[in-house]
């Protein structure tokens, strides 16, 4: 079907990428090669599992409803388990489950489809921390699906090792077309979804550049056996204050992805950074409606923004992704 056409079209261009990478690899200094070899030594998953605290299942008064991973409904990725929050950072540093479970419960109750787990760079204990976080959240919330969000590839690998796929594949957050392109390889090797930022070094200057990055990453994923629909392309939502003239470009990029049968996502609330607190939900919900009209299939959002979630649920009705009933907002 269309998937095969996409695959054939991009595999033809794969060879020049391999040549460029081989050339780049030959220039890496010996000390860096040794670090890379240490970083590539196989993880001892049993040792990691033995080193983390036992997971206690706590009744948080909310369960994650079973979902069909094939559903056409818009996918919200809850953004609130993030080490930039002092409360969450402290909880991660001490492996204290309570603040993390509380944030998870609030987002699940509000209707989040996935939860993002951002542990930061986690250089010293990334694999242990991500293993603990994945087990903690999935064992407490009926295998809630997760996006594993860190620059530490070994942490993502360790998290996927203990991940339960009942409600959806794990998401690798994220690759780009520059220094983070190998996150696509990680997703491919682990049958995961990968968020693919359509940028290399800095923000793409126009949609021609965005699509060049998109096709480069698509080519790579397909050559490694991924399904095109497991790459979720992120056009990069830009701040209105300072980049107002670029907003339609971002929306048009989403349409370009959609026209090629590709899925898309992104940090939607970026657009309203720096705007007054009372204005942000209004901007975010207007933008999500416009973006869904262009074919946006997912976004990384604060699910506890009620206006935004009601807008998304309503757009799912208009797009015929969900059957209307008078109680659709309570679903």
Predicted regions and their residues:
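Catalytic beta/alpha-barrel core
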Residues: 116-121, 144-152, 169-178, 198, ...
